[in-house]
């Protein structure tokens, strides 16, 4: 199989010589090739057994395997790992054998184990929390989705209190209110929110251009981060533009702001308790910023959030929506998969540019600019003004 080895080497060389967009294209091509070469049996086995990955990853996370193995200086045997982590030796051997088959770990020629890129990924707290959140909070919802839809004769899901989430967890509350009563389930979600991803909207957002002739008076707000969580956007803005005048305000619920105080700088960023389901108190700010907020709500609730901001705007104000913008055609699996998940749990959706513009128009807003900052999965800062 020298030809296969040569092709593999060529692909690795191509991946090393290109950017993230090129690597994504290579991944897509390889995935499409894999699917096209599968036998019917291969296809069914893949669909049936892919579910093992998150379950086994969760077990590895519970054991602390990924953190431990990523710190080991030499290959470890299954017995050594089992004894160190408090696991049955045969169980550890079987777990590692599966993990090696999907590259969660790497198996050496002498049947020992070292970390892989996936091991390193699952050792990062924010990314590990994302996997655990998916297992604990999303998997049960997706398992309930087929029966939920069949029982209702396959309607559109547009109500946050009438989704597969309620069926999965036997509750009449929406996802966020129910999770707030479940400290063990929401813990990983909170850690996930602290993960600071790069690149971010400031990678391509032309602040000076968007400021135009706007001039900051002492009490005038430059940037209001609505539902801004731990304040990452505010911090990044102040770090990149330390001399830019104007107030930078982080808004969220009081418990969130209390948690954020540990990471916020001592000066330059104000904390303001605010629920975005109520009218916006800061008048005439230049930028009202919403990052990954509206995707969590069905259209009617997302519209209400925008309508709570519009009365506070003046002619120079802009609402900046930082969110996913999947294409109408050729959306990638990560975008379409996210869409199915948030539909099932929240009654919401990933919106195309057309859908964002239609939603904003109902609130009296119009799109002025769109600045994409991730490829090929599209995340972008969309700038809206009053009509």
UniProtKB/Swiss-Prot annotation:
Binding of substrate, residues: 135-148
UniProt cross-references to Pfam families, sorted A to Z: Dimerisation, Methyltransf_2
Gene3D superfamilies given in the database record: Vaccinia Virus protein VP39 (3.40.50.150), Winged helix-like DNA-binding domain superfamily/Winged helix DNA-binding domain (1.10.10.10)
Cell membrane recorded as keyword: no
Ligand binding (S-adenosyl-L-methionine): 227-228, 252, 275-276, 291
Stretches the record annotates as Substrate binding: 175-195
GO terms of molecular function: O-methyltransferase activity; protein dimerization activity
Name of the top EC class for this enzyme: transferase
GO BP: any one term: methylation
Keywords: Methyltransferase, S-adenosyl-L-methionine, Transferase
Record's protein name: O-methyltransferase lepI
Source organism of the structure: Aspergillus flavus (strain ATCC 200026 / FGSC A1120 / IAM 13836 / NRRL 3357 / JCM 12722 / SRRC 167)
UniProt lineage: Eukaryota, Fungi, Dikarya, Ascomycota, Pezizomycotina
Gene designation: lepI
